[in-house]
Amino acid sequence: MKHIVGYRIFFRYLDYIWNSEEHDWLAALLGGMSLLADGSPADPAYESDWNNAVEKISDSNDSYQAGIQFLKDYLEIGYIEEIGQILSDMEANKRLDLWNKAVYDVEHDLDDPYLRFVSE
């Protein structure tokens, strides 16, 4: 996967939003984006979606812009209001505090992008 650190930052950012707002569609997106033990996403399509987003932006190391492009591409499949609002907020540079927190977490290995199976 291209720019795995950027992917982890974007995942953590979305996870922070989900933890504050608990949108169903965002939970589904995060579930598919969660990483398996081998480092690949639970839904293999997200690896190519992320790689395509990274290829489309001018600076492949700019994970914020890659996240914006990822959401644009995701919404081309079908518009989902909750995801569209996150995209609008990113384009307007809102919630940068959450983005910066996500960057810090990933840089210090405080994130957990791995899929967990829980049995009760």
What are these regions (language model features)?
Residues 51-78:
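Short, solvent-exposed interaction modules
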Residues 73-120:
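Amphipathic alpha-helical binding modules
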Residues 1, 41, 58, 117-120:
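Short intrinsically disordered terminal tails
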Residues 1-35, 67:
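Short terminal alpha-helical segments
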Residues 5-9, 25, 46-49, 62-66, ...:
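Residue-level detector of well-ordered alpha-helical segments, enriched
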